[in-house]
Amino acid sequence: MPREKQKRGRRAQEKEKREENKRKLEDDHEEPALKRQRPSSEDQAEPADYIPLDSGEHEEQEIPVADQNDTPFYGLLDTEEQEYFSRAAEVLELNQFQTAEEQSIFVESVYEEAKGKELKIACSQSCSRLLEKIISLSSTDQRRRLFGKFLGHFLNLVQHRFASHCCETLFVKVAPALSHKTHNAPKKQIIEEEGNEEPSLSLADMFLQVISELEGNWGYLLTERFASHTIRVLLLVLAGEPVDLSSHGSLVASKAKEGVEVHRIEGQERVVSTKHHAVPDAFMDVLKKVMADMTAGLDDTYLRALATHHIGNPVLQLLVSLELSHFGKSTAKDSRSVLRRLIPDDTMEEGSQSAIFFTGLLYDPVGSRLVETIVRSAPGKLFKNIHKNIIRERIASLSRNEIASYVLVRCLERVGRDDLQTDLEMIIPEVPNLIERSRLTVPRALIERCLIRNIDTTPLAKALQESLDKDPAKRLQQLLEVNNTDGPAEEATPSEKPVQGKPKTSPVLLHKSLFVQKMLEAPGALSELVYSGLIATSTDTIINMACNSVTSHVLQKALTAPTSTTQFRRQFIPQFSSHMKQLALDTSGSHLVDALWDATKDIYFVKERLAQELADSEHDLRDSFIGRAVWKNWSMDLYKRRRGEWKGKAKGLDDKVKALNIGGEKPRTKSKLDLARERYDASQKSAADRSSIGTKS
């Protein structure tokens, strides 16, 4: 059967493509010219093989409209540039620099390569993280130059998915240097590539210029997905407040924020941004104006709607907090203040507009965060009305609710002794239900506040004892779920394995562990409930608890807490005998072994027995990183070579000598010559005294 005649080869394929494009072009010229429309998202997702040509008249009319609506595009890095910055990121990750000077030279070389491409890198998905790391390792002058490159583009950068993170890092790292005086750059320090001199503006002036760039857009940026985080950082910097981007519980960290770790050379200076920093006096006026502008265009209804908005709520929290902490509690009386607009009636009487709004936020996952901020920062009069008219009437239901319980905890942290005593009596009937449902946030806060306010915790201990089993061992199982801690290996299913190799911890078990640790701090019946349970628990269960990262902290607390008695430790510690090797080689168990060193100061014979077990396993311990740390903490080299000195150290005699010796210096042993000099001086002094007495007589 004859085959169809086909042309083969690259040239034939190119010829067919040219003919096909020619046919399409001829067909398009026959159709009437239509007005060009902005492509939809579906059209943008598909690659366009052919773009139709419009007449010049339509093109001139439509291009300005597109420029007004589209986000500015700063271009893409070419292949060679991508490869260079990828290799630079790998070099930083390996961190094989011998000195800090080598690292600074490398950072400067990256800046040289990035000249003129700073905006491209900041908007690049693959290179923006590298820029964040470089900013963290840069000097103040390098950051100032980069700041100057970003000026004029911040309105677009703060709304960009990747560039916004670079802006945040730049603001945070530059903030501690705001109080430094700006020196005039010499003529040699001129950027030659584009003929632009090093920015003459000070860092404070640069921040003020950022504010002017964003001015007029605050209302929109409050709820913008990426810009809201950067706006919060900017507000904190203006206020001189510490900014911690790594903390997921902070007001500025995103839930999906990926940590950008920076490896530093030993001895390299690190700028700590978790402390208050000095800011120019003009910043306070700017901060007040910015906060006023943010809410000036919003009516009260929309402002209250931000309380339940998942993006606007954190900004609203920050505005309330900064308003009350930096401009005084008296600002709450100003009708234009954020707090006054949210809560116009500070009496908080039942049925009032303020009470209805406040009550509606108590059980809302987002709104309750704002309530916590208000409770923590509100003036005393407003807080007392909130506690009296809203919290106390609903205290039972608040303690049972998973979300509202955190608001109750904030109230317990602030109330006085008499009010705390009343709240304790009202919450105690709910304790059995809370223990059964593992809602331990409120009971733990109650114990903590009672210890601070010096309130008797015996009624709380009785309520706990009645809600738990009478058998001490079973009681501890109910408190800690020790049956679920089956061993040192905390394996997770493939789908549950966490990112970055961190072991996944059960939130319920973590809360129970923290609750039991807080019980151990309370003297009397509360701590006795735990101590009796530990003594009654089997050795296998105790060892499993010691090898669990969560329950191990309970055992460490039981051994080192001030409420721990010598009698308890003498009964409890022998359970670890013959298990020291297993514990010393385990990540969690090794911390317990370290705690045993301090816990056995007054029971030396037990410490000596445990040390002998470690000495018998010397080879295995020295082969393990964790084991070597235990070997060092127990001074096992001293144990093997100079047993007498180790004995004194094990009994804590060295600490007593250091406490008696001022400054911790070793007392100098006097030589025979020093003693002879002292005797001679004493004899000379006595002879002089006798001669003076004879002269007087």
From Swiss-Prot:
Residue stretches of biased makeup (Basic residues): 1-10
Source domain of life: Eukaryota
SMART domains: Pumilio
GO molecular function list: RNA binding
Alphabetized InterPro entries for the sequence: ARM-like, ARM-type_fold, NOP9, Pumilio_RNA-bd_rpt
BP GO terms, sorted: endonucleolytic cleavage in 5'-ETS of tricistronic rRNA transcript (SSU-rRNA, 5.8S rRNA, LSU-rRNA); endonucleolytic cleavage in ITS1 to separate SSU-rRNA from 5.8S rRNA and LSU-rRNA from tricistronic rRNA transcript (SSU-rRNA, 5.8S rRNA, LSU-rRNA); endonucleolytic cleavage to generate mature 5'-end of SSU-rRNA from (SSU-rRNA, 5.8S rRNA, LSU-rRNA); ribosomal small subunit export from nucleus
Keyword match rRNA processing: yes
Keywords: Nucleus, Repeat, Ribosome biogenesis, rRNA processing
Gene3D superfamilies: Leucine-rich Repeat Variant (1.25.10.10)
Basic and acidic residues bias locations: 11-34, 665-682
GO cellular component: 90S preribosome; nucleolus; preribosome, small subunit precursor
Region span, Disordered: 1-52, 484-505, 664-697
Subcellular location: Nucleus, Nucleolus
Keyword Nucleus assigned: yes
Pumilio repeats: 113-148, 149-192, 213-248, 353-388, 389-429, 533-574, 575-612
Biological function: RNA-binding nucleolar protein required for pre-rRNA processing. Involved in production of 18S rRNA and assembly of small ribosomal subunit.
Similarity comment text for this entry: Belongs to the NOP9 family.
Name this polypeptide is given: Nucleolar protein 9
Lineage: Eukaryota, Fungi, Dikarya, Ascomycota, Pezizomycotina
